[in-house]
Amino acid sequence: MWRYISKQAYSRKFRNSHDSALLGFSQYSSSFGKTRPLQCLCEESTTNPNLGLSQNSIFSRISRKVRHLEGICEESSKNPHLGLSQNSLFSSVKGDFRVCGKRGSGSLGFLRSYGSAAEAIASTSEEDIDEIQELIEEMNKENEALKTNLQPKQPKTIGGMGVGKYNLLRRRQIKVETEAWEEAAKEYQELLMDMCEQKLAPNLPYMKSLFLGWFEPLRDAIAAEQKLCDEGKNRGAYAPFFDQLPAEMMAVITMHKLMGLLMTGGGTGSARVVQAASHIGEAIEHEARIHRFLEKTKKSNALSGDLEDTPGDIMKERERVRKKVKILMKKQKLQQVRKIVKQQDDEKPWGQDNLVKVGCRLIQILMETAYIQPPNDQLDDCPPDIRPAFVHTLKTVETMKGSRRYGVIQCDPLVRKGLDKTARHMVIPYMPMLVPPQSWLGYDKGAYLFLPSYIMRTHGAKQQREAVKRVPKKQLEPVFQALDTLGNTKWRLNRKVLGIVDRIWASGGRLADLVDREDVPLPEEPDAEDEAQIRKWKWKVKGVKKENCERHSQRCDIELKLAVARKMKDEDGFYYPHNLDFRGRAYPMHPYLNHLGSDLCRGILEFAEGRPLGKSGLRWLKIHLANVYGGGVDKLSYEGRVAFSENHVEDIFDSAERPLEGKRWWLGAEDPFQCLATCINIAEALRSPSPETAISYMPIHQDGSCNGLQHYAALGRDTLGAAAVNLVAGDKPADVYSGIAARVLDIMKRDAAKDPANDPNVMRARLLINQVDRKLVKQTVMTSVYGVTYIGARDQIKRRLKERGVIEDDNELFAAACYAAKTTLTALGEMFEAARSIMSWLGDCAKIIAMENHPVRWTTPLGLPVVQPYRKLGRHLIKTSLQILTLQRETDKVMVKRQRTAFPPNFVHSLDGSHMMMTAIACKESGLSFAGVHDSYWTHASDVDQMNKILREKFVELYDAPILENLLESFQQSFPDLQFPPLPERGDFDLREVLESPYFFN
């Protein structure tokens, strides 16, 4: 019998030996040795119902069998005739067959592999063995089911997509962020080889061929410079930093960064040396950090020869780190990878001085190696006209304090001519992401996977940066949550609208507010020697050149936007990571194609997730069409806007189906591309069998009514101001600009009735009466929130009057603008008295603080600390290979006037940013897609009613708090020795009226 038992025990392999490890224990751990016998599990079941074991369970039944067998064991120790010793197989098995767990702990701590025990249990009969075997097999099934329930389930989707697709896109995203420059350099190397072998250069686009022609000599010159640095023959201060990247990557970064600046330089084809050097130096340092890390973590056999003498333990540690990084990369644990990169990179930051020195030297080498040759229309017997592509010159700029000179890099006119075709060949960093951004966890933890990402754009303001870093993370949770919500909104390209844009652009622009792709021809020089004619000609030439510069700048801007659109158009969707300015307003980190941009950007972007229109969605689409069509239609009641769209159904269908071949009704809109996108969406819905079930991807906008004044009216509980900016219900939206224009007209009519002999403004009033409308005063009313000055208002109104050409004499035009500006500001003060008093109070408090040489600080309702960055700038001179550069650095002295004038608008912007973020969080909790553009909130057509309810509730919640009282208290706590003015008097406006106002946002 015992031989049979032994045979049973040894004839089977132990199964499920890994079960214990899966649950956190190994059979060699200390916990394992202290486990209690199996019957403890059955005892547990009576006190721990979570285990799901009853007295009739398999565990209980087998426990009774085991107790029977244990009795045999005990008997064997007393009765040596049984032939079992304490060291026998059965004894050892008896000791191993255990389950651990604390009595009453509420959870199963460890499950031993019962298959292995079953194969070793002894019995007094074969029937016992068979019965136990059956029980064990049954129990193993229960064990597997229990383990499955205990193990954490892997998510089936991440970011709304399958795990496999997500991981694939994430790998692509990592490649985009870490290998962009390397891929560009590789492309140039391959093009050079192709050109040598197959003569492909003539087939390349113009700017691509220029880049290719500059690349090889620039790369070789950088390599030669690096060799001098290595040999110690170059004693330049930049030498230690010059060889940290391969020459080909430095060449590509230098070309692309400089050309990018030239493209965005206002159409002049020039870039300031200090700006260009800083941009190039920063890009080189960042890429060097990634390159250095990747080199460090290579396998030991790939390390360079100077590591042969490295001690073995260091080599092992490096190999360990490399393997760890590799595993983490496979698991997509990018946060841990970034942390390791930071820990392993023991290099100190280069510092601004060294950055600009490296940048200047690279620019200098590019200037020495990059040449351009005009097209082959020169005479055969003339030497070829080969000239430098870039030159370094000095520009003089006249300022109020005198003239200033600064160095610029100027490109040749032939290079400038090709700039607006360059975007498609540029490496554009901070592209929209293919996967949801990393959640924000700290000042520099979130958004992009590898690219440096900071939650706030501090622009070198140290105090603001430190203030954000010092705040407990818990305090910033609402801010993190709001930014994550904005970043997780998935977008895609509207390919139909993009196709129309491409057709218009390919045919020369000039439609739908797209700039003409051709320059205005310069006027011919007159033959006459008349000085007046020559002066007139020069004036015309100057105007044409200015116009062409503006066109060039707009062309570059459109090309950059379209370059991004073309790269992203085949993607199912993409995301815009967001961060904040110092006031707490949220912005997409990608700068070119985003929903904060122009009508072009907004027209070709849509939500990647579609939703059925539902009962209200089609109505909101019609309202949205009227809003983007504009021309006064957007000021009608909702019913009026719906009627406008329904009256233009034929135009809508024609625009959607034949946008360029038909009547082109959509081109008459103020926002033509958004109008076209809406026409297409409405046409699709109306053509479908059931419009309510038609899927819409279009974001519908709800915009505040002069939102800054809405916030001031709420702060001051101003009844009159609240009515002017739609905080109270009305039959149609109140138009604050028309309201101010009406007041201005009343004042001017009173003045016009006076005796001109006693008041010089009488004639000006009579002249301007017919010119007063909402357009004349709109910009001044809008900027009143930002503390517009009398001079600012005068210049704004002067521009409007000059456009109309009513007053030709410059002196009279200036005088009329002065009078109109004073009148407009008077009307504003009358209508928004509470806003004016709050602005004055905020400015007075700021002045008191700034006079003590302290910046103004406050904390937004969402817990974000704000420090105004306005300090006097000091000059710091750096000698570089190009020129002596003047770097500006903050001093300890604050700018009192700027601190005072900027505080009121900055404070209100921090409040509108808080309102937007509160709305974003609430929309996410309600399952809505949400995008925000400061005072414009977007969601699907079917969800507009719900979003409207949320944004009103959040506005009331925001201003139910004692905001001004809290601000004054924080000032008094920070500066107990200073005397602050009392809070301004406020009105009796009931905030809850906002909840019933249909046009608060509309």
From Swiss-Prot:
It comes from the Eukaryota. It catalyses: RNA(n) + a ribonucleoside 5'-triphosphate = RNA(n+1) + diphosphate. Residues 1-21 form a transit peptide. The active site is at residues 703, 778, 935. Disulfide bonds: none annotated. It holds the Pfam family RPOL_N. GO terms for cellular component: mitochondrial DNA-directed RNA polymerase complex; mitochondrion; plastid. Keywords: DNA-directed RNA polymerase, Mitochondrion, Nucleotidyltransferase, Transcription, Transferase, Transit peptide. GO terms for molecular function: DNA binding; DNA-directed RNA polymerase activity. The highest levels of expression are detected in the mature leaves. The level of expression is lowest in the cotyledons. GO terms for biological process: mitochondrial transcription. InterPro entries: DNA-dir_RNA_pol_helix_hairp_sf, DNA-dir_Rpol_C_phage-type, DNA-dir_Rpol_phage-type, DNA/RNA_pol_sf, RNA_POL_N_sf, RPOL_N. It is found in: Mitochondrion. Signal peptide: none annotated. Its EC number is 2.7.7.6. Belongs to the phage and mitochondrial RNA polymerase family. DNA-dependent RNA polymerase catalyzes the transcription of DNA into RNA using the four ribonucleoside triphosphates as substrates. This is DNA-directed RNA polymerase 1, mitochondrial. The gene is RPOT1.
